[in-house]
């Protein structure tokens, strides 16, 4: 992955140096197990442990001749060890070390990835608590629907990220696999006990039945889980992009001193981070598709998967890590315009409460069809400057079924806030500690009564 979208901490894990370190870690764990079972001399293991080292430049040099990177790696390490080097890679095939080393890399990468999840969830939790009662327009089909709160909206994303994290955790658990069963998975060159011992050393589980490789359904699940990270990131990114449109203006990404939005238009403040994350999410999903293509290999293995995985595993982990961190920064610096949210609610002149008026009329004895017809008529007859509440009071037919006291209860939004408080308390925040502070009235006449 290009450095622009790489956090150094994650990039280091997927560097060539780190990859070969993981290969060497596997090779030494195998030699240790073989020495324990007296398959190789104890002195050979001690020599390997003391002298094994590699040079990426030397490996690249050898590979120009061998056209095989694992052989080049083994040759380089062996030449540094001396006579005992002949016991390096003893009884192994290349995929034994490659697949097991990839498992080791993924476990290391997961530590960084989950630290980013922790940070993102913490920031989201703070925003949910802060804006639990910040009323905003809920939209369906891009149109005003009913009142919600900004905190409630974000709480849905928080829970989605928690589910996504769970998917990643389960996928990583499925990738904690050691495979040392040889060229076609039959343990022809060393016993299964070696695999078990190495698994204990590395914290991995033996594959039940392998071919030359670990079955690629595991890898596909891993990349699918990272693709779901992209999907969760994109859903929130798209929401933030819509809310930042000039006509909406409910949130604004942080704009730092000296930052510029356009080479031609000095006034521009664009949602560049949310747009960037939308694009990166496409790559994560695309890589998941490529991983699915790798599942069906020929017989006991071909190498059609290899070139793909050299790209998609580093790229997907690096991108997911970067995307989570960038989203955390977006939310950390996000300006939430509560006044604009209130004004946007007022654009609908109180119609966001029409469903509650409908139910109030039904409770007074009207059929649903009759009540719907009355409320729809009053809504569609609203003129500029009107509010649904005032027109219902003035309408002879509607006022027979809902009076001022009924409407006052509806148009404060208190019912939504109480129920939202209950839901957030159970799912997100833990037990509620009193009511959140109210927000002041917006300028001019508001379609929402009282404080919110």
Residue ranges and their predicted role:
Residues 1-22, 46, 62-66, 83, ...:
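Glycine-rich cofactor/substrate-binding loops
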Residues 1-181, 186-187, 191-197, 206, ...:
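A helix-coil-helix interface module used to build multimeric assemblies
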Residues 30-33, 113, 117-120, 124-127, ...:
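Amphipathic alpha-helices that form helix-helix packing interfaces
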Residues 32, 105-117, 226-235, 240, ...:
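Alpha-helical support elements that line or immediately flank enzyme active sites
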Residues 40, 248-249, 367:
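Conserved hydrophobic residue
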Residues 152, 220-228, 356-364:
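Short, well-ordered beta-strand elements within core beta-sheets of diverse protein domains
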Residues 164, 212-305, 310:
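Glycine-rich anion/phosphate-binding loop at the beta-strand->alpha-helix junction
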Residues 195-212, 216:
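Active-site-adjacent "gating/activation" loops or surface patches in catalytic cores
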């Amino acid at each position: 992955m290009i450095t622009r979208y790489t956090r150094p901490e994650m990039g280091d894990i997927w560097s060539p140096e780190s990859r070969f370190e993981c290969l060497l870690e596997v090779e030494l764990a195998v030699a240790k197990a073989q020495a324990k079972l007296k398959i190789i001399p104890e002195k050979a293991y001690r020599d390997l442990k003391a002298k094994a080292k590699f040079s990426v430049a030397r490996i690249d040099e050898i590979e120009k001749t061998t056209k095989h990177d694992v052989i080049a790696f083994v040759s380089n390490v062996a030449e540094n060890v001396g006579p005992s080097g002949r016991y390096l890679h003893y009884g192994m095939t290349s995929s034994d070390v490659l697949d097991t080393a990839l498992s080791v890399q993924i476990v290391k990468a997961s530590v960084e990835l989950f630290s980013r999840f922790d940070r993102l969830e913490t920031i989201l939790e703070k925003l949910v608590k802060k804006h639990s009662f910040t009323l905003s327009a809920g939209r369906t089909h891009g149109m005003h629907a009913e009142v919600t709160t900004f905190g409630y909206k974000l709480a849905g994303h928080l829970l989605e990220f928690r589910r996504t994290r769970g998917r990643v955790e389960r996928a990583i658990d499925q990738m904690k696999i050691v495979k040392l069963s040889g060229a076609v998975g039959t343990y022809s060159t060393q016993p299964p006990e070696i695999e078990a011992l190495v698994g204990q050393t590395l914290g991995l589980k033996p594959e039940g039945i392998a071919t030359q490789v670990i079955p690629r359904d595991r890898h596909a699940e891993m990349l699918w889980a990272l693709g779901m990270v992209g999907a969760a990131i994109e859903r929130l990114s798209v929401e933030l992009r819509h809310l930042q449109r000039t006509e909406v203006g409910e949130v604004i990404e942080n704009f730092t001193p000296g930052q510029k939005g356009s080479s031609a238009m000095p006034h521009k403040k664009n949602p560049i981070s949310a747009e960037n994350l939308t694009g990166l999410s496409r790559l994560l999903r695309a890589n998941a598709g490529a991983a699915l293509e790798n599942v069906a290999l020929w017989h006991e293995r071909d190498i059609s998967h290899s070139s793909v995985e050299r790209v998609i595993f580093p790229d997907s982990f690096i991108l997911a890590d970067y995307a989570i961190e960038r989203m955390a920064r977006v939310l950390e610096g996000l300006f939430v315009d509560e006044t604009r949210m209130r004004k946007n609610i007022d654009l609908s002149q109180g119609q966001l409460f029409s469903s509650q008026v409908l139910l109030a009329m039904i409770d007074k004895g009207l059929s649903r069809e009759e009540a719907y017809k009355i409320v729809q008529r009053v809504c569609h007859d609203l003129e500029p400057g009107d509010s649904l509440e005032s027109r219902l009071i003035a309408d002879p037919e509607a006022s027979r079924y809902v009076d001022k006291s009924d409407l006052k209860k509806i148009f404060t939004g208190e019912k939504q806030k109480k129920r939202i408080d209950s839901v957030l308390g159970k799912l997100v925040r833990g037990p509620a500690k009193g009511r959140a502070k109210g927000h002041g009235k917006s300028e001019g006449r508001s379609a929402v009564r009282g404080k919110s």
